[in-house]
Design a protein with these regions (language model features):
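Glycine/proline-rich, positively charged
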Residues: 91-164
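Short N-terminal micro-motifs specific to bacterial/archaeal maturation
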Residues: 29, 58-59, 88, 125, ...
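Hydrophobic faces of well-ordered beta-strands that scaffold small-molecule active sites
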Residues: 14-18, 53-55, 80-84, 113-118, ...
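Proline-rich low-complexity regions
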Residues: 14, 74, 87-88, 107
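N-terminal binding-site loop/beta-alpha segment at the start of enzyme catalytic domains
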Residues: 1-80, 137, 143
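Conserved radical SAM core fold
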Residues: 23-25, 87-88, 120-123
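Structural motif corresponding to the early beta-alpha repeats
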Residues: 59, 75-94, 119
Length: 164
């Protein structure tokens, strides 16, 4: 396995990551997870050198993080970096951000998330997140040790957009 250091964070992570959006049949719309198989798959990936695992609050009807949390018991959490995502379209206040973070930490059975991302961000959602104080929320998370960093993955074109 090849590893890379993530920017200025100094976090060493595998070049190959494991995405937890689709487990057994979820690609065809089936969101019922065979938990035993999914946990086994995640642990085999980690045992094989994968250290970067990606999930999100909404994946698999909000069950992906639960299964990942179970897979990361027995010392597996200490071997990985977790990236998960807050859904901008499901938050309307800082209280919503705090509630979702609390749910995610509980489901993942951890006290911190390494990479906390704003999910499916586009310009409109970015403006919404800024308006409800998401940037300050993410800064507070980092200060409190609940996140190493925050970011905004995007599949939508935002070229030439000012994100400040």
């Amino acid at each position: 396995m090849k590893y890379r250091t993530m920017g200025k964070l100094g976090i060493k992570s595998s070049a190959f990551g494991l995405g937890c959006m689709r487990f057994n049949g979820a690609a065809s719309g089936d969101s019922v997870i065979d938990e035993q198989k999914a946990v086994s798959l995640i642990r085999r990936a980690i045992d094989g050198g994968v250290t970067y695992i990606d999930t999100a609050y909404v994946y698999l009807d909000k069950t992906s993080e639960i299964v990942l949390g179970k897979a990361l018991l027995d010392g597996y959490r200490d071997r990985v970096t977790i990236a998960t995502k807050v859904p901008p379209d499901q938050v309307s206040s800082r209280a919503d951000l705090e509630r979702i973070l609390s749910e995610e930490l509980e489901k993942l059975q951890t006290d911190h998330i390494d990479f906390y991302l704003m999910h499916a961000l586009n310009k409109q959602k970015w403006e919404h997140m800024k308006a409800i104080g998401a940037c300050e929320f993410f800064d507070d998370m980092k200060r409190e040790g609940k996140s190493a960093t925050s970011a905004f993955p995007s599949t939508a074109p935002m070229r030439n957009s000012n994100i400040s």
